[in-house]
Each structure stands twice: as C-alpha cells, then as structure tokens.
Amino acid sequence: MKVPFSWLKELVDIDVTAQELEEKLFSCGFEVEELIPLDAGISKVVVGKIVEMEPQEGTHLTKCVVDCGSYGHDIRISTGASNMKLGDCVPAALDGSTLPGGIKIKARKMQGVESNGMLCSGEELGLNDDLFPGSEVYGLLILPEDSVPGTDIAPVVGLDDYIFDISITANRPDCQSVLGIAREVSAILGKPLHMPAMDYKAVCDADAPVSVKVEAPDLCPRYMAHYVRNIRMGESPRWMKRHLALCGLRSISNVVDITNHTLLEMGQPMHAFDLNKVAGRSITVRRAAEGEKITTLDEKEFTLNPNNLVICDAEKPVALAGIMGGANSGMDDATTSLLFECATFARDSVRKTSRALGQNSDSSARYEKGVDRHSPEMGLARALHLIQELDCGDITTLEYDLTDGRPLERRHIVTTPAKICGVLGITVPDQTMIDILERLEFTVDVQADGSWDVSAPLYREDVESFPDLAEEVIREYGYDHIVPTFLNTASVTNGGLNYDQKQQLKTKRLLAAQGFYEASTLAFYSNAEFDMLHIPADDEARKAIRILNPISENLSVMRTLLAPSMLNVIVDNLKKGNAEGRLFEMALVYLAKELPIQEHPHERQTLCLGAFGPAEDFFTVKGALEALAAGFDLTFTYQRETTSWLHPGISAAVYCNGKRLGVFGKLANEINAELEIAKEQKDSQNIYLGELDYEALMSCVEGGLRYKPLSPYAAVKRDLALVCDEAVACGDIEEAIKKASPLITEVKLFDIYRGANLGEGKKSMAFSLTLSDPAAEVSAEQVERTVKKVLGNLKFKLGIEIR
C-alpha cells in the first residue's frame, strides 16, 4: 500500500526524516518494501528565470539567457518550446544534470549555437497535472512568478516528498489506509493524531423516497446509505488531486474523487449509485440468483450464482458487493442525485467471489482482509463532509443504517501486568505498558485487585486476548529489550530425525550422488496434465480431487501422479536454455477412494525421477534405481510393461520381493512431439521419467544393520554377448543367469547392439557376470562349468545363443 509522507504529515506532526520513520515503522512490525523519493533520478535541475530571448535564425529554436541564481545569472540555453515569455520562471537542467529515466544533460551545440543545458517540460520531470498544474501543457513548465532563481526544483514542484510502499499483513486490516498508518506513527512518535474532519449538516429533505434493505445480513453485517441531491459535477481541488496522484490514481471528477479519497484515507470502500438509473429507487443486498448477469464498470460481463453477493435495484444487479459497481448505475455528467453507500461485507464472501470471477479491485483487496463494523460510519461521515466542503451537492436527511443486530461495542480484556510480562519473558514497568496501550487508543482501567480491564478500539478486531496486548506492548517498547536466555530446565533434549526422515534423507543423498537434483513442485495441477500424458479416461490416476476454490484452473485438482509435474519442470528448463539435467522429487500424491470425496484421501509418499539431455539414456534412470537398491541392500528386478506415457519398447516395471514399485522409461514419442519446445530440441532430446511408490519401496527394507564378511578370495568376471529375439526382456535374461549357479553374485547389462548382421528381429545384449565364493577361490573349471550351465539354461528357456 502506498502512503505519501506529506499526507502523513497532515495527520501527525512528524519531526523525523522519512528514512528515520521507515526504520521506526519496521521496528514496530510494518515492512516498508520500498521508500520511493519523488525526485529520484533528478539532479542539478533548478529554477531558471528567462531574462533574454530571441529566435535562433534559420531554425525553430529560441535562444534564451537564463538567470539560475548562484549557478550563473546569464546561462545560455536554446529550446524548441514556444509557450514561454520574458520573465517566466522555468525548470532548467544545467550541464551535468540528470532527469528521470537516466537521461544526462550536457552542454552542446544546437544548430551551431552553444546550449549549456535544457529547459524542461513537466513530463520530463515525471510530473502530471494532478501533481503540479500545467505539467501536461505542450511546452515548458511555467513555474509560479515568485519562484527564486537557482532554487532546487524539487520543493518548487512538490517533488520533495516520499512514498512509503508498506506491506500490510492480514492481521492488520485497520492499517489499510493513510489514517491507519497515521495512527501507528502517532503512537510511535508520541505525537497527537489530527483526525480528518467528519462533521456535516443535512440541508434539505429527500425529494423522493428511496428504499434500502438487506436480505443477507450474514454476508453484510452493516450497510449504511445516505441520499444526496442536486449533484454538481466539477473538478476536484488541487490538494485532493495531489493526494490521489501520489497514491497512483488519476482525478476524474469531484464526486468520484471523493469516493476514491475516502477509500485511501479512511480505508473504507464506498460506492455512489445514480438514483436516476436505479430501477424503482430501490436498493437490496442479497445473494445472486442462478444465472443472473452483471456488467461491471470495466465493461466485463459475469454470470452469477447464489454464492455471489450482489446489490440490486428493483430489476437487476447494480453492483458486485465489495468488488465493483455495475456499469448500469455509475455516475456521469448528467447525474443529479446519488445514494452513497458504505458497508461491511463478509471477507470470505468477497474473496470467493473475487477469485471465482477473476475480478479484483482496491475495494475487494480491503474487504478480503477485513473492514470493521465501525468503519462504514466513519467513511460515510468523511465523504459527506467532503461533499459539503467542496459544494458537490445537497445532503438530505434521508439515511439508512442497517445491521445484523449485534451491538457495536469495544472488546474488553481482563488481564494483569504479570500475565503480559509472562508472555514477553521480560519485565516492563506497569506505567510504561499503560502509556503504550493508551497511545494506541486502548483504554486501561486499573481494578482494585490490581488487574486491568483493557478495552480495544473498535477498529482493532484482531485484539482478542492478553497475548495480543503483549504483542502491542513489545512492538512499541522495542524487541531489542528482549534478552536471549536459556530455557529454565535441568536438561535440554536435542532434536533429531525419526526413522522415516532418516530413510528419506538417505534416499535423497543416494540420488544426489548419481547427479540428480531435488525438485519441488506444487501439490496441485489441472486435469489437462492427464491429457498431456495420454492417460486413459478410465485410469485410476484421473480420480483427482477437485479444489473447491482454486487460485486458477491450472491448479484446480490435487495430484495423483508426480510425473506430470516433473515433465513440466523439464519442459520449463528446456525453454530457459538448460539442455540437460537430472531431477528427482519425493512428495505426496492424494488418492481418493471415490468421487465426490467422502473421506480423507490416502496420502502416499511417491518418488519421481526425471532425466533429460542428448546423452541421457535408459540406463541413466536404471543406474539410479540400482544405486538406490544397493544403498538399501535390496535387489530390483525388471519386467516389460506398457504405460501410456512411456515408450513401449524402452520402459519397464520395477519389482522388489515380488512387489511392484513403479515404472520408468523413455517418454513416449507421441507425447514428446506435442511438447511446447523447439523442434530441434524435440529431435535431439532424450527425456526419461520414472515414478515409484516410495512406501512400497521402504516396506522392502529390513530394519537394523546386517553385516556380511568380505570374501578373502578374488572375484572372477566373465562377459557374455548374447543374441536373442527383440521380444526377450532383459529382466528375464538376468533372472535365468542368476538361477544357473550360486557362484554368480552379480549380473550387469552393459551393452545392447542391433544390426543387419544379427538378422531381422534380433538384438545382442552384453552382460558382465561376477562369480565368487566366500569359502574358497573359484577355479577355472568352476567358471567354465558355470558359463556352460548359463548358456544351456538360456538356450533351453529363452532360445538365446552366444554371439
């Protein structure tokens, strides 16, 4: 939220610099994201008085002699402007000066005549008419006649100001206004707060009846309205235009500006209905009917439902409650009578409608954080005062104040100084705490028994109990008073990881050792992700739980697979120029027994692997899985399996102890062709994915450590190149080899070859066999017999020949 320093000074007698105030606000819990000087980028620009001027022969330029005070009384500057006259004061950017946007001004010749600077327009200084009148005139900015030559330009045109860009947390909706921040500044500096004037006087009766009613008090706890007739549209005064401009708004007309000014100053959103456009001169706050439509002030049409709160006339909706008015009831130059409204709407209702319709506004931003029930009264009073002050219309006696029946009263909290200090862990003098609370507009009534009856201001709905009071005390007293101390206990229990956390950490380290980096994605995506992976319509993975109020349609369902998220991460990396990489993610997937969901879904821990790059292949992921198996003393087996999102010939299912853990392989060609990446990337990239049920994997791990003595005898290795049919699976060959002899302790595939010399439908697979015996050295005869048995088994069971 943007808060001008000069506006704060109107409400509080500030005696510190903007930089000092920024530090004080931060120490009291307000993050100033940026302190913006209005004269940023401007240097060595001063008031210059034109003392001589003559046309520059043969050009459109005018040669001027400018009095710039202490910088020189006869500085010669040429300009292409024509709206100045002798004696005018104008902004002069001297040799070596800078202007907004990084523009540097240097002395140079213009059409053969030396010019020692530049005379500036308002726009060149970053000004507009709302900030300083005349800034948008084509030509030079003409300054007031009494401007002193040589004076820095910033204070002359109002650029000697700062904007505080403050991040307001959700628990402090009372600070969503200049007044809210001014209250805090008043308490911080111990200076009195000058409240904006809110007095007004009704000068006439209503010339026609107006009906106002609330049919949904649960969503609209308070609705206030006041009828103003004989509206006189016109320009706003300069001070109001400047206030709006400093906060980023343009002046429109006096009445519209009053509603915007009230929003910024008081934090109270308000709207004015043109009663000539309100059917039946009737206003009703109700839930929308199914299929009802409204076109808002920004000319967007929305179809509504009963979850949306609307303000209607006798025929149709005229505003989205708390968000934006309708185009069919807005003000224009022909407006003669207005109904000003201020209300409190349920924050959840505004937030859900705003998200569902994708419609946001300054009003909805405030209502979503919360507007207290006292705020409409103050906001409407301030607006009516301004209407009377600016003579915009005649205030009638017709007013409405409709509530949900709850009394409007201050919340009382009974506590003791000891309780507050107990929360803080330090001792703060009683009187100091009372002074702090009273500066923050709390009242403290000290009881006979020493307890305090503290009442919170009406606008502080966030203060509910004595820990909240402790927070108010310490942020004003200073967090630096809190001294770090050890816990008052005989022993301290060090934290640690439980078994599951240790296993997860071990898994991550094993994968990191294989060159994989951890990825972290959101737990939501859209149903379109299932289409991206060509997952069949009847697949269990499509039973995704839909979010009731998603941030966007792209994040509308809870994930049932990690693979779509991993593929999106890979595509994003490729788009950003990362041509290769290895990634893994360990996260939960959410599996519903039935839809719509009736009970809490099963949250299953899942592991996903992703590898991409021209050099990556099937064995990248398989090698990572083998490293994982070795790290947990497991043995994985692999079987051919078809999955919609993997290549049918370059993929496999992973098993351990007979349990299916998951699948891995190369991304299916048809999916790769549909990826939103460059064609050359599609042609050169190899993308591999794998997804495992991590819980099933961990169930195969035996608890405790087991030790096996190393064999004192050297192991023997033999390599076999085998020719088989394309249909023969690698896992079947490995299993047949291992069953041939107990001497075979390890089998590794290290090469696959296909060629015309092998014959059609044939492939060659090369395996490395490790033979060892812990009790004796393996002899050459044993090796020979084992190899013969292996080859015999392979030929008999799978029809495989040695190459």
Identify the meaning behind each predicted range.
Residues 1-202, 339, 358, 362, ...:
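Phosphate-backbone binding interfaces of nucleic-acid-interacting proteins
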Residues 33, 47-78, 246, 259-328:
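Conserved mixed alpha/beta core segments that line enzyme active sites in large multi-domain catalysts
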Residues 39-43, 200-203, 455, 491-492, ...:
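Beta-rich nucleic-acid/ligand-interaction surfaces
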Residues 114-130, 135-140, 154, 311-408, ...:
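Mobile "lid/hinge" segments at catalytic clefts and subdomain interfaces of large enzymes
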